[in-house]
Amino acid sequence: ITMADNYIERQQEQYEARKAAWKQAQKYGKKKLTAVRPAESKSHTSTVSKPEDSKRRVFITGGAEGIGKAIVEAFCLAGNQVAFCDINETSGQETAKATGAMFHKVDVSDKNALENCMQTILAEWNDIDIIVNNVGISKFSSITETSVEDFDKILSINLRPVFITSRLLAIHRKKQPSPNPYGRIINICSTRYLMSEPGSEGYAASKGGIYSLTHALALSLSEWNI
């Protein structure tokens, strides 16, 4: 289990360069891609090819827009089998059409809806190799103007789904007679878990929770190769 910080946004240039290289390779019928490093290291390139047996079954939360959409695109670009969920149906359908990924409209704060989504995917794929817990919202406001309901809403979207998806995958793996030797859960954290600012109590608490939860999950889920 690993955590991804907001550096993903700063890596966008690297991703766009790799995407452009892939499109060029498709245009000229090449089978290998040139992986371009970030701007400060553009002089260093390497050839990357992806073996067929390394394709994975990937589930991403909050994949319709922004960072989530870029994650969906990247996994699809690498030839993986991808499913994602999002509450925004219009953007979700557009991303699914553009990438070929499977889209599920889900409000992740609804425990039953999120669990049903994962159960549907598990029934179709038999297992999930990679989960990316990306979904998240932020609301920065004075603590005197932030209601308890506002605080709870942020945690129900940012933090609780990390536990729900991880727990469900563990339950599924525990039932399998032959354990899957591969498993990864990537949780999107933030520098705000440690470097907060006024009015960010809900967001900071959710990201701090993800940071701590990831450590605990890493110990608990290692039994099932996650």
What are these model-derived regions, one by one?
Residues 53-81, 217:
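Canonical Rossmann dinucleotide-binding motif of NAD(H)/NADP(H)-dependent dehydrogenases/reductases
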Residues 171, 219-223:
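Alpha-helical segment proximal to the catalytic Tyr-Lys
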Residues 166, 206, 214:
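Active-site helix of classical SDR
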Residues 190:
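Residue(s) in the substrate-gating loop at a strand-loop-helix junction
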Residues 146, 195-204, 216:
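Active-site loop-to-helix junction immediately N-terminal to the catalytic Tyr of the SDR YXXXK motif
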Residues 78-93:
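Conserved glycine-rich Rossmann-like NAD(P)H-binding loop of the short-chain dehydrogenase/reductase
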Residues 142-143, 147-155:
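Substrate-binding pocket helix/loop in short-chain dehydrogenase/reductase
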